[in-house]
Amino acid sequence: MNLLSLLLILLGIILGVVGGYVVARNLLLQKQSQARQTAEDIVNQAHKEADNIKKEKLLEAKEENQILREQTEAELRERRSELQRQETRLLQKEENLERKSDLLDKKDEILEQKESKIEEKQQQVDAKESSVQTLIMKHEQELERISGLTQEEAINEQLQRVEEELSQDIAVLVKEKEKEAKEKVDKTAKELLATAVQRLAADHTSESTVSVVNLPNDEMKGRIIGREGRNIRTLETLTGIDLIIDDTPEAVILSGFDPIRREIARTALVNLVSDGRIHPGRIEDMVEKARKEVDYIIREAGEQATFEVNAHNMHPDLVKIVGRLNYRTSYGQNVLKHSIEVAHLASMLAAELGEDETLAKRAGLLHDVGKAIDHEVEGSHVEIGVELAKKYGENETVINAIHSHHGDVEPTSIISILVAAADALSAARPGARKETLENYIRRLERLETLSESYDGVEKAFAIQAGREIRVIVSPEEIDDLKSYRLARDIKNQIEDELQYPGHIKVTVVRETRAVEYAK
């Protein structure tokens, strides 16, 4: 390779380097120019956006300012109108006051004129009265001189003569006034009673001594009776209610004079039929469950009754006793319904006489409360009711109303008299009571009480409409030999003390159970 070639190569390299540098520099300048242009564009765009945002914010501020100005102007207009209305009202009141003031001024002037006239007339009357008195004195002196009697003697003689003439007329007038007053009192009393009776519309139906349980089919009767009658005997023994299973299709009749026991038996039997499992153990469980259900129903009935008559703050135990009245009858009349009716009647009578209606309702509701437990406690229902009212802190007026509603003691308040009157109204209403049913129930109660009076007797149930008394005894106190003796003693006492048609079967039941648990 010669020198020329080397120079050419070197020249080419130099030219290449120079050319590359020039190209690179041009490219760099071009990129810088583009970057500057881009930066300027970005800045310009940012300025434009900032201007737009500024314009938007200004517009929004103007709009908000306009809205605020309009709201402020509206509030100002409303306040101005309100002030104008108030000013108008004040002006009207001021005008009214001015008119009233003018009227009062005129009335004062008229009154002053009348007073002056009255004073003038009074002076004239006084002058005339003085002259009349002078004339009277002169005439009296002249009469005394002529008659020879003093003024006092003449007055006494005249009064005696007038008294003799009027004595008979006065006696006749007094007699007429007494008759008129008596007729007025009778009429007022009748109007009060009629008003109270007309304001109360109450329906009562005579209570029955039987309940009917419907069955899904007649095959259920055999299951209720059980093998050799053990199921029906268990149910009758636990409830004291007679189960009558006859040809009546798909029905069993429960007979018993105690409505609570009958309801327990009915509830238990309905639950047994629904459950389908009928055997002595299950019967015991269902009877216990039915007792709890009936106990709840009793308490609910008491609470409903106290709520209906607005008798608040009554002791819970007393409320429950009131609920028991729902299962008690008096001559066929439901005692709870009767008590509520008496409460309403007493309240209406109290309202007519201006007495305390709430207290009258409370006394009316509780007047027969002793009947709820009179078959469990010794004494009349009045005595028991008084003791219950005292025990649970009732008002003295309520206690006296209970004590006096049958005339056992004198009533000490108008409320007591009104409760007695309301009780008589409710009981005397046609169809409210039946004498025969009450006598029948009393005979059955007496039969049970007589049987339970012997030692060792746990329970006694009158069944078969009173033709049988079933006596449950304690096996620890009464053995088999004593059972026969007890049956004979009860039979003899029934024959001596009770009156009854036909004959009564005395059955003494002694049951011993041995229970062990396998573990």
Curated annotation (Swiss-Prot):
GO annotation (BP), single: mRNA catabolic process
PROSITE patterns referenced in this protein's UniProt entry, alphabetically: HD (PS51831), KH_TYPE_1 (PS50084)
EC nos: 3.1.-.-
Major location (coarse): membrane
GO terms for MF: RNA binding; RNA endonuclease activity
Entry's transmembrane regions: 3-23
Keywords: Cell membrane, Endonuclease, Hydrolase, Membrane, Nuclease, RNA-binding, Transmembrane, Transmembrane helix, Virulence
GO CC, alphabetical: plasma membrane
Enzyme class: hydrolase
UniProt subcellular location: Cell membrane
Domain called KH: residue spans: 209-269
InterPro entries, per the entry: HD/PDEase_dom, HD_domain, HDIG_dom, KH_dom, KH_dom_type_1, KH_dom_type_1_sf, Ribonuclease_Y, RNase_Y_N
Keyword RNA-binding: yes
Membrane-protein topology: Single-pass membrane protein
A Pfam family that the UniProt record links to this protein: KH_1
Sequence ranges assigned to domain HD in this UniProt record: 335-428
Similarity comment: family membership: Belongs to the RNase Y family.
UniProt-listed NCBIfam families: HDIG (TIGR00277), RNase_Y (TIGR03319)
Role summary: Endoribonuclease that initiates mRNA decay.
UniProt-recorded name of the protein: Ribonuclease Y
Organism: Staphylococcus aureus (strain JH9)
